[in-house]
Amino acid sequence: KGTPGLVSPDGVADLEFRDEAETVNALVPELKARGVEAIVVLIHEGGLPTGDYNECPDISGPIVDIVKKLDRAVDVVVTGHTHRAYVCEIDGRLVTSGDKYGTLVTAIDLRLDRASRDVISARASNTIVRSATLAKNAEQTALIESYDRLAAPIADRPAGAVTATLSRVPNTAGESPLGDII
């Protein structure tokens, strides 16, 4: 629901933003009618945990109330937005977030009952991505370098000049006037 305040109005002009829990709950009967029993919700809303990246002894924020309002048929909720990492149980459901910018990978393990096809257990673990220790992919590196060469004449040309001071202090979306210019 907070998206219109975080992005350019032009980017969301034709979109509707509805209550997250009501929207999910309205779709559950349709999923059930199609035989779906294991339901995982991906939502761009999050929480503010305490603890390390694989726990959350005390979590607050919008996601807590949203999860509590979800239909009991929802088994797992994968969250985002707050750029915080956690693996929680909220109202008897697994709720996860994998931090920000690919710094963590969340592995979710669901066990399904073969007869009912419903989730009988769910657990997750966040793993730190140690990208500095990984070897570069030669083919991918060559592709990136070829586009860098193609873009260089344009990228190296000044697009304008600014005489005012631009703030680098980010807003709630993580954007700043200086960042927008760059």
Model-predicted regions and their roles:
Residues 32, 119-120, 131-182:
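Non-catalytic terminal accessory segments
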Residues 1-133, 139, 177-182:
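Acidic, metal/ion-coordinating pockets
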